[in-house]
């Protein structure tokens, strides 16, 4: 068993370095050996360089390296430098101490992979940006269960929204399994989920997502009223909805990605 695969060993390591898990960085360290193995298996095959965001104490990093991955680990918390240098000593890892949101993701090699226990507060903006780059072959990451549900939601459900459609536009999404709070130290207050995204190669479409964001900007309103409030000509929206066979009182959450694409075509040049 890894020396980082129990709450007791993690606590001892932190105490030895005079450290504590910092909520500002969303630090909940994975301490379940079984779940570490499952994450590594879900990420295979390692067909390109692996980027890990938020390596923490290095448990997942070490597991990936031992499985043959070429890993660049990006950590914002400079306090963890001596810990990672200890836990990953002698292993061929590239450590980068930087805010992951400021990393030049658009320059990573084509076919790269993300494998990470993501700091939950940056998960949505980071995953969105990585998908937009078009440079990743696979993204496998832990997030709050609620965020995983939003990424994989179906139309007409409360979790369905902009994030669902952003993910669906760029990738095939799978929620592989859930992890209880006890799989981490310190245990978070919520369950977590492992998500795997397999990009399809679709490029970013700013016009489509302006429409989607406007549609969900006033979720309680009808789609017609939400788009009118965002500046889309009401008569043009009514005409486009009729052409799609949609009732005037339809709401944004009832449309799947293809319906939004067709609606966008019908509204082309309306704003």
UniProtKB/Swiss-Prot annotation:
Its main location: cytoplasm. SMART domains: rADc. Belongs to the class I-like SAM-binding methyltransferase superfamily. rRNA adenine N(6)-methyltransferase family. RsmA subfamily. It comes from Thermus thermophilus (strain ATCC 27634 / DSM 579 / HB8). The keyword Lyase does not apply. GO terms for molecular function: 16S rRNA (adenine(1518)-N(6)/adenine(1519)-N(6))-dimethyltransferase activity; RNA binding. Its EC number is 2.1.1.182. It catalyses: adenosine(1518)/adenosine(1519) in 16S rRNA + 4 S-adenosyl-L-methionine = N(6)-dimethyladenosine(1518)/N(6)-dimethyladenosine(1519) in 16S rRNA + 4 S-adenosyl-L-homocysteine + 4 H(+). The lineage of its organism: Bacteria, Thermotogati, Deinococcota, Deinococci, Thermales. Disulfide bonds: none annotated. InterPro entries: KsgA/Erm, rRNA_Ade_diMease-like_C, rRNA_Ade_Mease_Trfase_CS, rRNA_Ade_methylase_Trfase_N, rRNA_adenine_dimethylase, SAM-dependent_MTases_sf. The gene is rsmA. S-adenosyl-L-methionine binds at residues 28, 30, 54, 75, 99, 117. This is Ribosomal RNA small subunit methyltransferase A. GO terms for cellular component: cytosol. It is found in: Cytoplasm. It is an enzyme of class 2 (transferase). Keywords: Cytoplasm, Methyltransferase, RNA-binding, rRNA processing, S-adenosyl-L-methionine, Transferase.
